[in-house]
Amino acid sequence: MDNKYIGILTSGGDASGMNAAIRAVTRAAIFNGFKVKGIYRGYEGLIAGEVKELTTEDVSSIIQRGGTILKTARSETFTTPEGRKKAYKVIQKENINALIIIGGDGSLTGARIFAEEYDVTCIGLPGTIDNDLYGTDFTIGYDTALNTIVECVDKIRDTATSHDRIFFVEVMGRDAGFLAQNSAIASGAEAAIIPEDRTDVDQLETFIGRGFRKTKNSSIVIVTESPENKNGGAIYYADRVKKEYPGYDVRVSILGHLQRGGAPSANDRILASRLGEAAIQALMEGQRNVMIGIRNNEIVYVPFVQAIKKDKPIDKSLIRVLNELSI
C-alpha cells in the first residue's frame, strides 16, 4: 500500500472505547509506515467527503474519552447503490486503499456490501454495547455499558429498599440479552427478561414473590429493551404486574443513553487497543473483508458474512445461575 492511505470511520451507535480503537489504529498504522485518514460522521461523512489526515498528535489523550472524536451517524444514503458510488469516488479521490470500520451489525453489513461492489479492502472492528456480533467474545463498549448499568441498579436498589418497591429497569441490547442477563447477575437482581428466554408474568411473580415472602423488601427486574414494544419492554411488564398483582408497588426506570456514555473501562481500553492494532496486522497479512474479534483471549479474523448473519448465542447456564441466586 505504498503512498496509500488507510481510512477509518465510526458508524452507527457510539460505544465507549471507540476513541481507544481510533488511537490504536492510527498509531499502529503510522508505526508500520502507513498514513491514516479519519472520516467524520461515518458513512454519511464518507459520502460527503469529510476526510482529514490523522497524526499521532490528533489521537493523543483520547484513550480515556467516551464517544468518538470522528463523530458517528446512521446513513440511509449509504444503503443505496447511488450513495455507495459516491462513497467510492471519495475513496478514490482521497487515495484510500483500505477502510477500517468501527461499529455494529448494520455498519459491518454496509462494509460487506461496499467491499463486494468495489475493490476496496474493508476491515471491521466490533463496536457496540449490545455485544451481539457473532465470532467475538466481547465487543468494544460492552464492558463499560455493563458497569454503568450495575452502578445505576445499585442506586435504584437503595430507593427500592427504602420504599418496599419493585423496579423494572430497562436496558439496551435490542435482540440480544447480554447486557440484561449479566447486569442482573452482577447487581443481584431478582430476574432478567431477555429475548432469548421470555418470561411470563406468572413466572415473574414467582421470582418476585418468593423474595418478599422471605426476607426481601425490594425486587429488581432487568428487562432488555423491545423496539416498538413488539414483545414488551419494562413498561409492558410493569403494567402487567400492576394489573394482575395489585398488591405490589411497581416502578419503572429506563436507563437509555446513559449506557453509551462515559469513560471506557480498563477492559474496553485494552480490548479496543488490541483490536485496533490487530487490524493493521491483518492488513499487512493481506486479510480483507473480515471483522477482528477476540475469542478465548486470542485475536481472530471473522468473515463479515459470519459476524453479521449468525446469531450469537447467550450462555443459557447463566439463566440458571440467576434463578438460583435470586432466592
From Swiss-Prot:
Belongs to the phosphofructokinase type A (PFKA) family. ATP-dependent PFK group I subfamily. Prokaryotic clade 'B1' sub-subfamily. HAMAP family: Phosphofructokinase_I_B1. Catalyzes the phosphorylation of D-fructose 6-phosphate to fructose 1,6-bisphosphate by ATP, the first committing step of glycolysis. GO terms for cellular component: 6-phosphofructokinase complex. It comes from Bacteroides thetaiotaomicron (strain ATCC 29148 / DSM 2079 / JCM 5827 / CCUG 10774 / NCTC 10582 / VPI-5482 / E50). InterPro entries: ATP_PFK (IPR022953), ATP_PFK_prok-type (IPR012003), PFKA_ATP_prok (IPR012828), Phosphofructokinase_CS (IPR015912), Phosphofructokinase_dom (IPR000023), PKF_sf (IPR035966). This is ATP-dependent 6-phosphofructokinase 1. ATP binds at G13, R74, S75, G104, D105, G106, S107. Mg(2+) binds at D105. Its main location: cytoplasm. It catalyses: beta-D-fructose 6-phosphate + ATP = beta-D-fructose 1,6-bisphosphate + ADP + H(+). One of its GO terms (molecular function) is ATP binding.
